[in-house]
Curated annotation (Swiss-Prot):
InterPro entries: ATP_PRibTrfase_cat, ATP_PRibTrfase_CS, ATP_PRibTrfase_HisG, ATP_PRibTrfase_HisG_short. Catalyzes the condensation of ATP and 5-phosphoribose 1-diphosphate to form N'-(5'-phosphoribosyl)-ATP (PR-ATP). Has a crucial role in the pathway because the rate of histidine biosynthesis seems to be controlled primarily by regulation of HisG enzymatic activity. Pfam families: HisG. GO terms for biological process: L-histidine biosynthetic process. This is ATP phosphoribosyltransferase. GO terms for cellular component: cytoplasm. Belongs to the ATP phosphoribosyltransferase family. Short subfamily. Its EC number is 2.4.2.17. Keywords: Amino-acid biosynthesis, ATP-binding, Cytoplasm, Glycosyltransferase, Histidine biosynthesis, Nucleotide-binding, Transferase. Pathway: Amino-acid biosynthesis; L-histidine biosynthesis; L-histidine from 5-phospho-alpha-D-ribose 1-diphosphate: step 1/9. It catalyses: 1-(5-phospho-beta-D-ribosyl)-ATP + diphosphate = 5-phospho-alpha-D-ribose 1-diphosphate + ATP. Lacks the C-terminal regulatory region which is replaced by HisZ.
Length: 218
């Protein structure tokens, strides 16, 4: 039996919708009263694990799940040893550098050397500024990183942006985009090579499902 790691949060609904289109029904995870973290599809073909987004690639890398669905931002940050199979074309967002709208900084290169940059995506932020050859101090924050510039603790932030509304409401503005992110289908490399549980067929069905679902997945 295949095991699928599903992310809690914004990607869950469309992940379940896509899996249901290929005959795997984990919609019980969407029930408001559900407290189960593991359920079996009614067909008996697969088991679903409901985990934090950051943990999806961990379960897949260690083989406790053969496949999983997670945002590219998490994959880029964590660099897990997993097979990247399909861009699922939903869950769009972008990784951006943002500063106070009232600041003089119009691009990252305007930031003074050794500025502080707050982010929960420490590796992505460090990689970006190293690429610019601009020395900055990355300040790890795991709550509302917008407070960094607001309180004066940091000159900038690196964070995921969907609509930009949160930035605007807190007086911040984007000055550049590091990369764009969508949901991705990943697999345990050995399980995929061995075609465990007829995994290749399922992946192909999901790939075809993405194409047919494109008009409604957002």
């Amino acid at each position: 039996m295949l095991t699928v790691a599903l992310p809690k949060g914004e990607l869950l609904k469309n992940s379940i919708r896509l899996l249901k289109s290929v005959g795997l029904d984990f919609s019980a995870f969407l029930d408001s009263g559900n407290r189960q973290l593991q359920i079996t599809d009614a067909s008996g073909r697969a088991k679903g694990l409901l985990v934090r987004g950051q943990d999806v690639p961990v379960y897949v890398e260690y083989g406790q799940a053969q496949i999983g669905i997670i945002g590219y931002d998490v994959l880029r940050e964590k660099q897990p040893q997993v097979a990247h199979l399909v861009d699922l074309q939903f869950g769009y967002c972008r990784m951006s550098v943002a500063v106070k709208a009232s600041s003089p900084y119009k691009s990252p290169l305007d930031l003074p050397a050794h500025s502080r940059v707050a982010s929960k995506y420490v590796n992505s932020a460090r990689e970006f500024f190293q690429g610019l050859d601009l020395p900055v101090e990355i300040v790890p924050l795991y709550g509302s990183v917008e407070l960094g510039p607001i309180t004066g603790m940091s000159e900038a932030i690196v964070d995921i942006v969907s609509t930009g509304r949160t930035l605007k409401e807190n007086g911040l503005v984007e000055i550049t985009t590091l990369y764009e992110s969508t949901a991705r289908l990943i697999a345990h490399p050995l399980s995929y090579r061995l075609n465990t549980g007829n995994l290749h067929q399922l992946v192909e069905q999901l790939r075809e499902g993405v194409l047919s679902e494109l008009p409604i997945l957002t």
